[in-house]
Amino acid sequence: MDNLQPIVLSAALTLAFFWAIKINNHKLGVWIFLLLGILPLIFIYLRYPDFRVYDWHGFLHASIVYQIINGSIPPNNPILAGEPLLYPWGSHLLVASIVSLLHLSPATVFALLNLCFLALTLILVFKISLFLYSDRVAGLFAAFMSIFGITFVHRGPFAEGLNKINFLVNVKLFRMDIRATPVISKFASSGANNQFGILLFALFIYSILHIFCHVKVGKIYYFTVFISSLGIGFFYPIYLPAIAASSLACCAVIYFQQGRLFLNKILGLIACIVLSIVPILPYLHQITTGKVQTAAITLALFKKQHLFTQSFTYFITVLPVLIIIFWKRKLLLKILLNANLSVIILITIVVTTALMWIFMTSPTGVEYKYLILSLFTLGIFSSFCFRDLYSNQRIICFILLSIFLIPMSSFILYDSGQKPITDPYIEKGMYLFHKQPNENALYSYISSETKPDALFVDSYLTIPVFGRRQLYIGLDIRRKSFGWGKNDGWTSTAKRLLSEQGYPSEITDLRRTVASDFYDKTSNKISKYTVDKLAKISKKNDVYVVARDVKTNNKIAKSEHFNKVFESGVTAIYKFSNRVN
């Protein structure tokens, strides 16, 4: 019965969408569609309240916001105290400002921004499709398909079937990455960065269509290109290469087709992109300086296996919609023969972002972000097919749409709320408080009795959120007790997060050795090496160690360098002092 739930939900969503199409000529039709468009997100937040706080890297993003509120700009890494954050923090600065202004928790602000970004993206996609095909129904299909379901390959029963084909897995022909679809899953996550990037990318597409497809171009569209590029560079710089590559590709295609006639527009577009990067160069320098090369995104021009796997994966992913486009090829040919430059521009962007997914590689697989943009743009382009199906083969259209929505339905029903959380909480104003009295007493002491730049050694990863202070280094000791069976708000291990952000192993390994010394059950004494390392740090910052069991308490209490400053049950806080009594 559980397997039928996504199918039933998909059919219900398709029925609701068809109803929205039916009333789209009503003066409130578009607003009703917008409401329907954000309902899946509202449903997730209402059905799984913890998802809003814990989802994906929820604690990571909240802890960065708290670092900024504490006065750290640029923020330090909350799980690598004192080290600058090698991760885009533009959206966290925005969220921190709203949190301080409205006295709402970061999780609440992230959720509100997600709803706003989703609604604005739906509007922009509708406008883009309207520009392409001059058809309101096609616009509704574009918004629907690009956000909610452009492929059914990545999640659901079909995806599970593909992953069971041993031949594909063994010869590495197919590399499934469920993070890429459905696009709405990006709008459900915290961080307000990826989703803002998708919105700004849609604004970029909308702007260049106006620039190249109108004889007289308002300066406002050059300005919006500038703003979209600047915004992406600040809020989600990984999409900046996609804007640059798409701009150059579109300029090349248009110059080849139109010649010097569009030269002024081409130069104007390139100038906007270049000028938009100048103001954020110091910011980009800050978040990239110090990254090790192994964390970088590189070209995989000579990695045959990678290129073949990425190409085959992309082909399988888009095959369902390609079949439908091929089915409606006569209609597509008619559109292209009408010299529809806007469609050519959109196809160019689809191909460019697809090639970026194929030819770029990174140890963390972060190139999947370009797959998101390609599928998102392909969803807009393919709307003419579904518009025609709706007019001429409505039952087939209903069945196909229901199938395409199965991944989203699976995400809503299962992926967004399966795991129990590790730490029950209460939201009050700007902050999260732990429901367990002893734990809450610990974090209350930390947040009220220690300096904002104090750093802590702890076997848990909770202090950056509940105590709003930095960890000397994030340890994965606690995770070993529950593995991946619970949601701790970080999703990835601390070790992986630091590695993905590009911190040198020399720094992280040293700190991990020092911090782990306190929780090593095989020894009963703090090493001189650990004391010496903390002594250097304590010259600039107060250093505290949290003990959560009797053995660790006894071990730390033996050292003359640590003074107990807090105790609640078996949990205690010790402050490091280089002065020996």
Predicted features along the sequence, with ranges:
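Hydrophobic/aromatic-rich transmembrane helices and adjacent perimembrane loops
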Residues: 115-121, 241-243, 363-389
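Membrane-embedded, hydrophobic transmembrane alpha-helices
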Residues: 1-28
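Membrane-helix boundary/interfacial segments in multi-pass membrane proteins
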Residues: 3-4, 48-58, 82, 103, ...
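Signature aromatic-anchored transmembrane alpha helix within multi-pass, membrane-resident enzymes
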Residues: 30-31, 265-277, 334, 341, ...
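Membrane-interface alpha helices of multi-pass inner-membrane proteins
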Residues: 221-237, 248, 274
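Membrane-interface helix-loop-helix junctions at transmembrane boundaries of multi-pass membrane enzymes
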Residues: 25-28, 212-221, 257-270, 323-349, ...
